[in-house]
UniProtKB/Swiss-Prot annotation:
Protein name as it appears in the record: Elongation factor P
Gene Ontology CC annotations of this record: cytoplasm
Family of this protein: Belongs to the elongation factor P family.
Main location: cytoplasm
Role played: Involved in peptide bond synthesis. Stimulates efficient translation and peptide-bond synthesis on native or reconstituted 70S ribosomes in vitro. Probably functions indirectly by altering the affinity of the ribosome for aminoacyl-tRNA, thus increasing their reactivity as acceptors for peptidyl transferase.
Keyword Transcription regulation: no
GO MF: translation elongation factor activity
Organism, scientific name: Desulforudis audaxviator (strain MP104C)
PANTHER family, sorted: ELONGATION FACTOR P (PTHR30053), ELONGATION FACTOR P (EF-P) FAMILY PROTEIN (PTHR30053:SF12)
GO terms of biological process kind: peptide biosynthetic process
UniProtKB keywords: Cytoplasm, Elongation factor, Protein biosynthesis
Record-linked Gene3D superfamilies: 2.30.30.30, Nucleic acid-binding proteins
Encoding gene, per UniProt annotation: efp
Length: 185
């Protein structure tokens, strides 16, 4: 059990049986009445974000999340299949369960799958991935009036803005949290 006075951003607690992550919180001490904690929580099962108010010192159970390292195998159109490297069990996840991570998945990539009571909640991708540029317009020397970037299609199908010097066939690093170009690999 964890007290609402110990809330921190990123903490996972169980609210009404669902695992929730604290996004924001604020301790409020009104002039009259008892202090309370106003928190913005993200339900990890549904993805919904809700604001809740708790009495100061109220105890909530901590949500125990398991993380398993798995290898991405393939996509059959409906599901994305991952293999547990220890037991060799395969798990099929929908695009909804993977979230935005679908855009950066490459075959044989190692990712962490997050479980709560045996149910898959989502995945944690590495912060950066290396992807190959398969299509982009050639950069014209001296053409920086447009901000110095151009669109590029990567091997996974995602389109992002890259600097003018990046060419087809280049391997680049992409930040999976923001979807931004980092550097050439």
């Amino acid at each position: 059990m964890i007290s609402t006075n110990e809330f921190r951003t990123g903490l996972t607690v169980e609210v009404d049986g669902d695992p929730c992550q604290v996004i924001e919180f604020m301790h409020v001490k009104p002039g009259k009445g008892s202090p309370f904690v106003r928190a913005k929580l993200k339900n990890l099962r549904t993805g919904a974000i809700a604001e809740r108010t708790f009495n100061a010192g109220e105890k909530l159970p901590r949500a125990i999340l398991e993380r398993k390292e798995m290898q991405y195998l393939y996509n059959d159109g409906a599901n994305y299949y991952l293999m547990d490297n220890e037991t060799y069990d395969q798990v099929g996840l929908s695009a909804g369960q993977l979230g935005d991570g679908v855009k950066y998945l490459k075959e044989n990539m190692i990712i962490n799958v997050v479980y709560h009571r045996g149910q898959v909640l989502g995945v944690d991708l590495p912060n950066t991935v290396e992807l190959t540029v398969i299509e982009t317009t050639p950069g014209i020397r001296g053409d920086t009036a447009s901000g110095g970037s151009k669109p590029a299609v990567l091997e996974t199908g995602v389109v992002l803005q890259v600097p003018l010097f990046v060419e087809e066939g280049d391997v680049i690093q992409v930040d999976t949290r923001s979807g931004a170009y980092i550097k050439r690999a």
